[in-house]
Amino acid sequence: MDSGKDMWSRLCLLAETVVMAAEEEEQRRRLLAEKREDSKSQKKTVSEEDDSEKRFLSHVPRKKRSSLVKRQQKPNGVSTSSSSLPDLNQIPIDYETETKQNPSFIERLVCDEEQRVKKGKSRIIWEEEEEADEDSEKRLFEKNLMKFVGHSQQQQKFETLNGASSSSSFLNLRCYEASLFLDYNTVESEKTETKVLPNPNYQSSSPSSCLTENDTSRKRRAVEQRKSGKVKKVKVSPLPRLSTETPEWVFQAMGHMNADAETPKLIFERTLFKSDVNSNLSRLLIPFQKLIRNDFLTPEECRAMQEDKDKDDEDISVGTILVCQAKQEDEDKDDEDIGAGTILVNQRFKMWGLRFKIWGMEKDSGHGTLNYILNWDWNDVVKGNSLKAGDNIGLWTFRCRGVLCFALDTW
């Protein structure tokens, strides 16, 4: 009996040992399978992030320079590249599909990037770029200051010859305002730059006589206009929107583009004019004085656009040039004056690659105004959104991977 009990206990112990070993083996296999799945999911996430970044960089406007176009010309003189920008919405979402269909896709991007690095230019100003030294900012300030002082001295000599006072010529100088001395333009300076400064040497009579003369001349003009039937119509500006809250679709577009986590900023609202939708001009004019806020640019972007504007001023001050040379220089200058590359998105999440830069307008009176402009593919934006004169638009700014982006709101 004792031997039978011992045998039975040994069998039970052996069975329990086998069951425990099987359970441990099953648990070990399960842990190995989970580790493999985790490693696969991590690799997939990294590859998806890389593909997403490559797709976003492909949306950035890449306008080839004239020198690159000449190098890529065929022996018979026909250029192999197109100067027009590609439609951003026709780019495949799957980056691997684009690479398979066009094997030279990656090589072309790398070649374009290397050429821009050699030229010392960049289509996009990134936030991670190193800030310039204080010495370069001082040199830029002194350069702009000498320009304005030189212009004021020329104006002073001209007015002195005509019998005007020398002090008034400098005080009434409003060509390009003092906001250009620095990289940032302030709202206060824009408000004060439109005011005409008084002439201290002006000998006038009593204030009451000035008011009386102005009132009488105004009344005479009104009576003459009534008699002739020519009455000027008063231009009434359209009422702005009652609410300036960020539209919901702007946040949706930021999520769709995987934009940086920041609050979008409303910088500009206006009713479109005929010049804004003119296909020959192909630009949206954004006057400095109409900006709602001006803190949406980085110091690097301000410095890059200011350097492009200085080049434009130097080109204008050069003497007479032959017509053929002027045309060639205009084409080269259009390629070199990059400004800041931007992306504009509308309410349907359709995107365009544009250029954002400073543009100065000179008037017949000798004074000038400074503006921002959006150009390059602006005609496509007008067609894609059916914009026309009289439409109201608003521009919201945000950043995606450090790139300046605009959201176009219409109402």
Curated annotation (Swiss-Prot):
Q: Locate the compositionally biased regions of type Polar residues.
A: 74-87
Q: Which GO terms describe its cellular component?
A: nucleus
Is Transcription one of the keywords?
A: yes
Composition bias, Basic and acidic residues: 26-56
For this protein, what is any one GO molecular function term? DNA binding
* Annotated region described as Disordered, given as residue ranges: 25-89, 192-237
Instruction: State the compartments where it is located.
Output: Nucleus
Top-rank taxon of the source lineage equals Eukaryota
Question: DNA-binding region located at which positions?
Answer: 309-411
List the keywords (alphabetical). Answer: DNA-binding, Nucleus, Transcription, Transcription regulation
Matching entries from Pfam families are given as:
At2g31720-like (PF03754)
Protein name per its UniProtKB record: B3 domain-containing protein At5g38500
